[in-house]
């Protein structure tokens, strides 16, 4: 039994889960120095969807955000979420780019990289793990937790051992869908503790209403660190409340040592932000409730709403139950991928197509075809060769590590954005987000030089002032 560490998620996963990652840097900048004095194990503040959201929606440079947080929080370890060979984008990238991104993340202030792969394919993590260790970061390798016939304790213990052998400094059980149950968590953590000799962290969303109980049983089984969120942006599709978990553990052998009065000051800062998000419609009250159907259908809450949205567009809302019944069949056909970005979208969309066309796999998305062909990596279970043939046709099945076939060069991307290039990190923004990054670079340049971008004549390089 030992003191439990707290990773605070309010600056990343909490608002990613509740308000689609729309919290601006200037909205939270004022509380950073107080948060630095709390004594968190770490502050999860970057990566995930924050990078995309900064460029696409907030007109912010994500690298500037990281540098500011580092400056204001010199005493707290900063943590990010990193999708291995996917980096923070939506496809696989070359080893050269992955290595460079990890280097620049650490150079700009990241201490801990939580690295995961949607298929739990350790090959997709190895380059990021190696780079993290090379540049002096802490490697937290994450297990994408899910349910299904193959996902038993033995499966997770085997994968955890693979991660430890690959170089992980700690392991995170990443329950992105809120599918863990309290006693199931206890058994899993006990087994993992007997399998690996590195710390274990627990990450569970409150979607199904079980996350606080999951944390408590995980702690009793030997978990070292838990993910929580300050109460104004906790619960619902977010995480257990930081203050509540700290209070629950006070005076026990697991006492976090954090001061509730100090946490209350942080809470008071975020309360008006929560009210603002509610008033603006950015925070839907439905996101704060419990969706027990998550446990019934075994799909993440976000995926459920996405499926409903697709059916509404097609005028087929009445087909939701059929689609939910189709999801596990599509998962089985495609090798039981865990349902997390991007595989949740791939499986979900294909399930919708199967139902609304009235014939399974009559229409197949490019992404589903690529996944079945092995372009995202090795699925947890082998895919039936006949099914692969049906979906992929004569296209070659990829059995090697997908990134072995990718040879993106940093210099090529740098040449593409020579006109806008201001910092080394711009190459990484562009490599992942293409024209989204270019539009941001244009706005940044216009603001810097007082230009009116609306009236630019790019063909003749004439800018209105």
Model regions: which residues?
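N-terminal amphipathic alpha-helix/helix-capping segment at the start of soluble metabolic enzymes
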Residues: 1-19, 66, 71
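Hydrophobic faces of well-ordered beta-strands that scaffold small-molecule active sites
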Residues: 6-13, 41-45, 76-84, 113-114, ...
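Non-catalytic positions within long, well-ordered alpha-helices that form the structural scaffold/packing
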Residues: 36, 106, 164-167, 219
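Terminal or standalone catalytic/regulatory effector modules within metabolic enzymes
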Residues: 36-54, 284-294, 298-465
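Active-site beta->alpha loop and helix N-cap motifs at the rims of alpha/beta catalytic domains
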Residues: 47-164, 171, 177, 181-182
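Glycine-rich phosphate-binding active-site loops on the catalytic face of alpha/beta enzymes
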Residues: 115, 175, 221-238
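Catalytic cores of alpha/beta
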Residues: 151-163, 208-224
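C-terminal helical cap(s) of enzyme catalytic domains, especially alpha/beta-barrels
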Residues: 234-256
